[in-house]
Amino acid sequence: MDTKDAAIVAELNNYAPFFGTASYYSSKLQGRPTASGERYDREKFTAACNILPLGTVIRVTNVRNGKSVRVRVNDRLSKKIGRIADLSGRAASTLGYVKAGLTRVKVEVMK
């Protein structure tokens, strides 16, 4: 691990779990490019988040039902929407909030 990678790991270790509202991507975005350059795939476990660096793996827990999923941050959110994460369709389905559209979540950086 080089110095830059070590600094990133040290920075990520400083993130305490945080809470907020999560939404999920519209199916209309399937195949469109994300901030990381990869194409959005609703079947992958990915997320958009403005708080954490691209490539960060996080555990997202639906606080209403206790279900959790691990996702990789590969995109950014519009700053106007007031959410902490926008999850892929598959991740939202696993967490059980597709019908509701939004849910309160706990986000933890995986070390």
Please place each PLM-identified region on the residue numbering.
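Secreted/periplasmic proteins
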Residues: 1-111
